Every structure is written in structure tokens, then in C-alpha cells.
Amino acid sequence: MVIGAVLAGGISKRFGEDKLTYRVGGKPLILYTIEALESASKIEKIVVIASPFNWQKFRELGLEVIVDALMVGPLGGIYLALSLGDSFVVGGDMPLLVPEFIDYLVAKFEEAKKLACVPRWPNGYLEPLHAVYSRSLREIIEGYIERGEYKVGNVIESSNPCYIPVESLPERWKWAFFNINKKEDLRKLKTFIKEF
């Protein structure tokens, strides 16, 4: 069992307003992510990692929140999540998560006994915000943060991870990587979610 950690500290610059509380199909966008995590059988507890500027919005939704005072981007969020235990880390702007895919990744992580289990595309591109990380990686991340190095990909590649080839996954599972950056992305989302 692992923690489900939802990174929610971004400023939504391209979206034009707080995208995670933007109502999509009648509910805040972040709740799609939360509900998928709640449906995954291998997720023990869910926390939202938020910035000092937006954490109250998520608490008002009844979510457990950790405030990210580090403010060094996703790497800081992963670091904080790992203080609670092994974590499946995801962006709060990913409304198409597949609970079976989450459980599959966690199972692969548990089986591989590596510091991270990360989906990887054929071109080498990683999906660091749809990945499982070991609590043991926290000390390594701390060293990167102390050196001012904040690229999650560098931490992953230095940790001898378990890679999951994206091309081997069912097509429906690949939708999970879709994230909302701009309001135009909501139009793309309509092709996936029938509530529109």
C-alpha cells in the first residue's frame, strides 16, 4: 500500500485562473484525480501537496493538505510526499487517471523493489507525475534540493528505476497522462469525458 500524493502547487499561468478548482462537469478539476485515487485498491491514503498561496482552497474541499514551503517545483512535492511513505505521485490537473493503471504501477513497483517505477515513452520521455517513488529516495532528493538541482528526471535516471514501457500499455491507460494546461485543453477533454 502506498500514499496517493496529488501535486497542486502550480500557478496555472497558461490557464488564466486556478485550474484545479475550475469546475468541469459540475465539480472542481482536482476531484477527478482524487476520485480515481480513491478507486485504486493499492492507495492507502490521499494527500494534496499545495503551495502556501492555494492550500486553503483544497482544505475547503475536505482534502488532506500538506503545505509545500520549499517551493522548488514538483521535486519538492515528491520530497514532501515521501515523508509519509512510498508514494504514487500525480499532477492534480490529470483528470483521466485509470485506477487499474495506478494499481498496476504500484504492483510493478512492489515487485521490482526499486527506488522508483516510472512510465517511459519509446523516445525516452518520462512520466514523472504518474509514477511511484520509494520513501528511500527521499534522502537522495534532499541532496539534489540542497544543490539547487530540481529536475525530477535527473533524480529518476540516477536512481536505477523500474521503467514501464508506455507502448506496452492498453490504449485507454495512456489517456491517464493527459493534463490540462490551457482552457483549450478542456475541448480535448470533451472527447474523453461524456459529461460535457
UniProtKB/Swiss-Prot annotation:
Q: Where in the cell is it found?
A: Cytoplasm
In the Enzyme Commission scheme, what number(s) does this protein have?
2.7.7.77
Which GO molecular function annotations are given, in alphabetical order?
GTP binding; metal ion binding; molybdenum cofactor guanylyltransferase activity
Q: Name one GO cellular component term.
A: cytoplasm
Q: Quick one: which residues bind Mg(2+)?
A: 93
Q: Name one GO biological process term.
A: Mo-molybdopterin cofactor biosynthetic process
Cofactors per UniProt? Answer: Mg(2+)
Q: Cross-referenced InterPro entries, in alphabetical order?
A: MobA-like_NTP_Trfase, Molybde_CF_guanTrfase, Nucleotide-diphossugar_trans
Domain of life (superkingdom) = Archaea
- Keywords for this protein: Cytoplasm, GTP-binding, Magnesium, Metal-binding, Molybdenum cofactor biosynthesis, Nucleotide-binding, Transferase
Keyword Cytoplasm in the entry? The reply is yes
Keyword Magnesium on entry: yes
What residues bind GTP, as annotated?
7-9, 19, 68, 93
Q: Which reaction does it catalyse?
A: Mo-molybdopterin + GTP + H(+) = Mo-molybdopterin guanine dinucleotide + diphosphate
User: Where does it mainly reside?
Assistant: cytoplasm
Supply the enzyme class, top level: transferase
Q: Check the record and name the NCBIfam families matching this protein.
A: PRK00317.1-3 (NF001457)
The UniProt similarity line reads: Belongs to the MobA family.
Q: Give the domain section of the comments.
A: The N-terminal domain determines nucleotide recognition and specific binding, while the C-terminal domain determines the specific binding to the target protein.
What role does it play?
Transfers a GMP moiety from GTP to Mo-molybdopterin (Mo-MPT) cofactor (Moco or molybdenum cofactor) to form Mo-molybdopterin guanine dinucleotide (Mo-MGD) cofactor.
The cross-references to PANTHER family, in alphabetical order and at most eight, read: MOLYBDENUM COFACTOR GUANYLYLTRANSFERASE
Alphabetized HAMAP family for the sequence: MobA (MF_00316)
Q: Indicate what this protein is called per its UniProt record.
A: Probable molybdenum cofactor guanylyltransferase
Source organism of the structure? Pyrococcus furiosus (strain ATCC 43587 / DSM 3638 / JCM 8422 / Vc1)
